[in-house]
């Protein structure tokens, strides 16, 4: 006989269950709207319907597309894509997978135990941003490396795995949506769930839409972090503080960044102004009005008064040294490109081909001058400078008549 044991919750407080059901209903209704749209273009238009128009219009194609990343971070991985596009190398897909997995964001996940609701929100936003940046990098691989068959097939499979409700990004998005109050952030929930239903073809072709999404997600996530009471100086890396304060100033959080702006402009500010009720301050102002103006900065002086520039001859110019060397993301592509750029060169066994050739030409010239005169010395130099037939890959036949030498 089979016994079925059932449990029942006898508590009278069911607010938690109602909130969970409401969140599931909201996410389910949004997903149902996208699943009911068959064409990929219709899903894209439905997503654009809930995206506000950015203040600067459409983003540029070469702009930063990573969420909460600096321009240097984005340029590093974008140069890796250009490296794959240039070098026709037999690249292992495992190498691309390692580079993709190393993409993160400058928002740090919370490590506090036990975590508070603000810490859980910070960790969820950080994971969503990192997975979104990895998806953008894979979409750029598919978009720019069209002539690399292996890269195209790898990027197509990765886009299929990374977009969807059952992907890693989909799991993190649903966890983040569960933490948000839907009444206040309904548009953000719609955009987060809507980007999960976009097709791999949309991610590979709509680069400008990715820039639109990046701009909206950054502003919305900053609103969430500031409203939850988190400090920008603690949740972001040090190299991203200035960018975070700039975005906060643009979206209207001027009160939160007033202290940072005062610190940044404190060094450039002049002496403190005198009090309005102080007569000495007024006298100082009168003296300043009647005194001679301060000398102009060198950059603001008239062009005729500037010091003339001295031009350095080309042979005396020093080559510019690169302060930062570009990091190669794919070493195999670098080795292949170096092999293709290599040119055949004439070298001797001792490794000093140039010095040996110069020494031989000098000896033949002196010997010819002593014996037969300057004409023979020119012939000797010409013979010494000619490479040997064993080293030269192909010799062009001489069609001009040979003038005999009279000795």
From Swiss-Prot:
GO terms for cellular component: host cell nucleus. It comes from Human cytomegalovirus (strain AD169) (HHV-5). Residues 273-286 have a biased composition (Acidic residues). Residues 302-312 have a biased composition (Basic residues). The keyword Electron transport does not apply. Belongs to the HHV-5 UL34 protein family. Residues 287-301 have a biased composition (Basic and acidic residues). It comes from the Viruses. Keywords: Host nucleus. Acts as a transcriptional repressor of the US3 gene expression through a specific DNA sequence named the transcriptional repressive element (tre). Residues 267-330, 388-407 are annotated as: Disordered. It is found in: Host nucleus. The gene is UL34. This is Transcriptional regulator UL34.
């Amino acid at each position: 006989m089979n016994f079925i044991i059932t449990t029942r919750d006898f508590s009278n407080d069911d607010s938690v269950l109602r909130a969970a059901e409401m969140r599931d209903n909201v996410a389910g209704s949004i997903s149902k709207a996208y699943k009911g749209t068959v064409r990929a273009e219709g899903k894209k238009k439905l997503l654009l319907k809930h995206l506000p128009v950015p203040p600067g219009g459409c983003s540029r194609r070469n702009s930063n597309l990573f969420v909460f990343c600096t321009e240097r971070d984005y340029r590093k991985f974008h140069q890796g894509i250009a490296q794959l596009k240039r070098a026709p190398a037999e690249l292992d897909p495992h190498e691309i997978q390692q580079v993709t997995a190393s993409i993160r964001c400058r928002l740090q996940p919370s490590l506090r135990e036990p975590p508070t609701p603000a810490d859980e929100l910070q960790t969820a936003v950080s994971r969503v941003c990192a997975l979104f940046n990895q998806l953008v990098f894979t979409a750029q691989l598919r978009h720019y490396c069209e002539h690399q068959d292996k890269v195209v097939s790898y990027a197509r499979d990765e886009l299929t795995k990374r977009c969807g409700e059952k992907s890693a990004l989909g799991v993190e998005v649903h966890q983040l949506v569960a933490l948000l109050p839907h009444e206040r952030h309904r548009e953000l929930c719609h955009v987060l769930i809507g980007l999960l239903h976009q097709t791999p073809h949309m991610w590979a072709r709509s680069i400008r839409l990715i820039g639109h999404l990046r701009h909206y997600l950054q502003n919305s996530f900053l609103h969430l972090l500031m409203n939850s009471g988190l400090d920008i100086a603690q949740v972001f890396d040090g190299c991203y503080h200035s960018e975070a304060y700039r975005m906060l100033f643009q979206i209207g959080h001027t009160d939160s960044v007033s202290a940072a702006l005062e610190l940044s402009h404190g060094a450039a500010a002049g002496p403190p102004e005198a009090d309005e009720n102080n007569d000495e301050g007024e006298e100082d102002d009168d003296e300043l009005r009647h005194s001679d103006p301060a000398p102009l900065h060198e950059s603001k002086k008239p062009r005729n008064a500037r010091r003339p520039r001295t031009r350095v001859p080309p042979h005396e110019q020093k080559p510019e040294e690169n302060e930062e060397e570009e990091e190669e993301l794919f070493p195999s592509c670098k080795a292949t490109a170096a092999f293709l750029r290599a040119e055949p060169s004439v070298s001797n066994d001792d490794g000093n081909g140039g010095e040996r050739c110069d020494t031989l030409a000098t000896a033949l010239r002196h010997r010819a001058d002593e014996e037969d005169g300057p004409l023979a010395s020119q012939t000797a130099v010409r013979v010494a400078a000619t490479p040997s037939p064993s080293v030269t890959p192909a010799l062009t036949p001489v069609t001009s008549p040979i003038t005999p030498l009279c000795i």
